[in-house]
């Protein structure tokens, strides 16, 4: 599982759109599921859309991409911008979902993704609108519990943790959605002692 920001930080990012090298490498490494982070928007909506389409067209094993709090309803009501439409089409082509179920041995795990508020603040080129991460997570967990027979519910989150518990988005998520068994927390690079 991966918590996002898979696309930046090395020279390989120069082929982000044309080769989808980072996403394809996650597949080579055996990563089953990822979500996106703020850096996936560094090449704007068209860059993210091109990367997803390139990864899909490669025919290679790539991880599932999950994010449950994109607010397509609000964007469609206002009329999708060109960038929003590009990402929506790429999502459909790639098969992006709110959650997926993976089987590891005898264990079935539902994995959903969420994009945090601070992540959005760090992605000024992101054209998408998002539902509140906590509320979207609650809805998704309820949907999983209703429709899936799983042993565990995991969240790949690009929200993060910080020392101030009142601002630590993934700690707040854990407290407000107690049916999540595991949160893979990306974004903040914070070391936690417990």
Provide a role label for each language-model segment.
Residues 1-194:
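Acidic, metal/ion-coordinating pockets
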């Amino acid at each position: 599982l991966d918590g996002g920001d898979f696309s930046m930080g090395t020279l390989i990012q120069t082929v982000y759109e044309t080769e989808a090298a980072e996403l394809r490498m996650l597949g080579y490494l055996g990563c089953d599921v990822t979500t996106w982070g703020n850096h996936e928007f560094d090449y704007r909506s068209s860059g993210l859309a091109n990367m997803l389409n390139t990864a899909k067209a490669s025919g290679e094993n790539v991880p599932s991409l999950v994010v449950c709090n994109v607010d397509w309803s609000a964007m469609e009501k206002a009329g999708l911008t060109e960038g929003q439409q590009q990402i929506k089409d790429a999502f459909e082509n790639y098969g992006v979902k709110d959650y997926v179920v993976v089987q590891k041995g005898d264990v079935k795990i539902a994995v959903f993704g969420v994009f945090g508020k601070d992540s959005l603040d760090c992605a000024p080129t992101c054209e998408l609108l998002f539902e509140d991460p906590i509320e979207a997570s609650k809805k998704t967990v309820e949907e999983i519990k209703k429709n899936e027979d799983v042993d565990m519910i995991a969240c790949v989150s690009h929200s993060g943790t910080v020392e101030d518990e009142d601002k630590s988005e993934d700690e707040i998520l854990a407290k407000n959605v107690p049916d999540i068994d595991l949160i893979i927390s990306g974004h903040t690079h914070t070391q936690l002692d417990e």
